[in-house]
């Protein structure tokens, strides 16, 4: 299983709210991004423009506030990649490697992978390729099989939670961060899988949304909504977690 490979990579040391309201706020932001014109984009500083193009790629890839359009997502990621290599390059690699919105083309996949900015990354190129391969193999499973989604989100949680800045930078360069993981889980929880309720509880508790930076004490009560939903649907981990909270007089 590819996700087990991710865990092995970590062990080997290669890399050292109301949530309903949060979802609504994200949706409003997605619509604002989608309304940007090329003139708006051209007026932005290069680094900001690359970040916005990456965001446009993400929302079109998953249909967040806009119709899902993998072909359009690819074009945004390509544009982002060309602006310094900090965003989008490995998203393009993924698309060409797996034929996501485009015909498979290993030459194009490698071409865009090489455009990624390697500055300040404490990981050698061979490990970047090997590690990203494991992540993207898990991603394609989650994209094509809904039952794999909770496990993929859990893998991202383990990879991104409480990591050094250098690790966070690496994951961002290949297309993953805490906030995107939270938004994916918020989207996929609509599939009705109780395991996703549990994963969303973990992400909320650890503030992957970034909504509780100034008020971290609010993350715990907000997470209980999702843990309770998971527990009521029979998720043993959620039942155990809530049991510990209630026995301690909390919740």
What is the predicted role of each segment?
Residues 46, 64-68, 82, 98-104, ...:
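Short coil/turn and helix-start
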Residues 53-62, 91-98, 137, 158, ...:
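Hydrophobic face of amphipathic alpha-helices that form TPR/SEL1-like repeat modules
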Residues 50-51, 86-88, 194-196, 236-238:
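Helix-start (N-cap) detector for alpha-helical repeat units in TPR-like alpha-solenoids
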Residues 104-121:
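TPR/TPR-like (Sel1-like) alpha-helical repeat modules
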């Amino acid at each position: 299983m590819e996700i087990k490979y991710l865990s092995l990579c970590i062990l080997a040391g290669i890399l050292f709210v109301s949530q309903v309201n949060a979802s609504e706020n994200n949706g409003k932001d997605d619509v604002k991004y989608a309304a940007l014109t090329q003139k708006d984009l051209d007026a932005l500083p290069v680094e900001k423009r690359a970040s916005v193009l990456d965001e446009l790629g993400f929302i079109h890839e998953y249909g967040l506030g806009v119709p899902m359009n993998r072909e359009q997502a690819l074009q945004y990621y390509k544009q982002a990649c060309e602006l310094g290599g900090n965003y989008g390059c490995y998203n393009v690699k993924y698309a060409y490697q797996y034929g996501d919105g485009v015909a498979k083309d290993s030459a194009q996949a490698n071409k865009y992978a090489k455009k990624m900015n390697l500055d300040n990354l404490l990981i050698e190129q061979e490990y970047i390729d090997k590690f990203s391969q494991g992540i993207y193999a898990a991603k394609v499973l989650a994209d094509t099989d809904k039952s794999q989604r909770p496990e993929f989100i859990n893998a991202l949680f383990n990879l991104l939670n409480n990591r050094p800045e250098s690790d966070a930078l690496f994951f961002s360069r290949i297309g993953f961060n805490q906030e995107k993981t939270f938004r994916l889980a918020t989207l996929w929880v609509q599939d009705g899988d109780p395991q996703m309720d549990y994963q969303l509880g973990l992400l909320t508790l650890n503030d992957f949304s970034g909504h509780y930076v100034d008020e971290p004490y609010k993350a715990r009560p907000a997470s209980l909504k999702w843990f309770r939903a998971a527990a009521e649907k029979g998720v043993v981990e959620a039942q155990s977690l809530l049991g510990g909270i209630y026995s301690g007089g909390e919740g």
